[in-house]
Amino acid sequence: MGHQEIDIRRVIPAPPRAVFASLLDRSTWPAWSGHDAFELVRPGAAGPYDVGSVGLLRSGRRVMREEIVEVVADRRISYRLLAGLPLRGYRAEFDLAPTTEGTKVRWHSSFDAPPGLGWLYVAALRRFTGRLLDGLAERLRDRATTTT
């Protein structure tokens, strides 16, 4: 297995609190992320989307089972993939930082891919996550214009 890392950055025109809330509440993801559905399998210790929370994200026939492993309010959400892709040790973080334009989001993931397929998973995850972040930016931009 070959070790892979992906790093994607976007500036989202919304405050960190709004970006964080949308990323943490995975029940909203089908509206903007490119996923078809979300199902909460197990709530976290301190709330439905806190550390220990396990959920299923469906995209077509693919179902990914993910667990939230770290939450730092308005700053970071980390999760690990439990099932759904043939990757080992998959872990990803959304890191948030305020900017004058809104929130800088950094999505970083690392994993071990099957031999010869690392490039394919890097390309697919980079494309999918880029669209996810673009969808989030559009959702929050639309929300801001309807509330002002």
Predicted features along the sequence, with ranges:
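Hydrophobic ligand-binding cavity/cleft-lining segments
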Residues: 1-45
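Intrinsic-disorder/low-complexity, polar/charged segments enriched in Ser/Thr/Lys/Arg/Asp/Glu/Gln
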Residues: 3-9, 54, 63, 76, ...
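Hydrophobic/aromatic beta-strand elements that line small-molecule binding cavities or substrate pockets
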Residues: 8-10, 64-70, 81, 90-98, ...
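A short, structured loop/turn motif at beta-sheet edges
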Residues: 13-17, 69-74, 95-104
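Glycine-rich portal/gate segments that line the openings of hydrophobic small-molecule binding cavities
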Residues: 31, 40-84, 135-148
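Short, cysteine-centered beta-strand-loop-beta hairpins and adjacent loop/turn segments enriched
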Residues: 60, 86, 113-117
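A mid-sequence interfacial segment
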Residues: 93-119
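A conserved amphipathic terminal alpha-helix motif
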Residues: 110-148
